[in-house]
């Protein structure tokens, strides 16, 4: 026998409530830092960076690796013992990626083409011809000079730092 409209509405409301309660009870998703080419701060180790990007074109005295990539270059710096001590991090984080800096040589990207002015996750800073968009929650910073993307920085997410502490 066909169910009445009232019974169907009641079933639909009940199903919606059950789904809503289940969604609220599910554990929160872990926020991770933004990654680039599979390289993620506080997770990827030096050997993995070399495997992904190949031989660096240079290495600084403090271990920052520089690579040539399509459209520019990338610098990868690593967590060292001093940083671990200063930030009171777990010792096993030493040797993982701290910061990835992409330097774009001829990017046509603008803040508008990336929808950054409308994105509430980013804070905008401006000084003369330089505009910076920061998203501390996700660990990403874009720098624009004369309206064009010049650098993209990937670092640890805010929540990752608190989880990384001892």
Residue ranges with predicted function:
Residues 2-17:
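Bacterial N-terminal signal peptides that target proteins for export
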Residues 34-38:
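Short, recurring structural edge motifs at helix starts
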Residues 1-2, 22:
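Helix-centric, low-specificity signal for extended rod-like, repetitive segments
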Residues 14-26:
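Bacterial N-terminal signal peptides
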Residues 44-166:
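A cross-family detector of function-defining hotspots
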Residues 27-33:
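Sec/Tat signal peptide C-region and signal peptidase I cleavage site
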């Amino acid at each position: 026998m066909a169910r009445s409209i009232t019974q169907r509405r009641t079933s639909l409301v009940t199903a919606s409530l059950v789904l809503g309660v289940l969604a609220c009870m599910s554990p929160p998703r872990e926020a991770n830092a933004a990654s680039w080419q599979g390289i993620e701060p506080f997770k990827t180790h030096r050997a993995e960076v070399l495997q992904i990007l190949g031989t660096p074109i240079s290495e600084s005295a403090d271990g920052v690796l520089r690579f040539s990539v399509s459209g520019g270059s990338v610098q990868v710096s690593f967590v060292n013992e001093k940083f671990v001590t200063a930030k009171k991090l777990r010792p096993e984080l030493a040797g993982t990626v701290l910061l990835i800096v992409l330097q774009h040589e001829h990017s046509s990207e603008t803040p508008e083409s990336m929808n950054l002015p409308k994105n509430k996750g980013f804070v905008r800073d401006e000084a003369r011809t330089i505009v910076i968009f920061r998203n501390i929650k996700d660990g990403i910073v874009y720098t624009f000079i004369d309206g064009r993307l010049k650098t993209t920085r990937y670092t640890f997410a805010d929540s990752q730092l608190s989880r990384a502490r001892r």
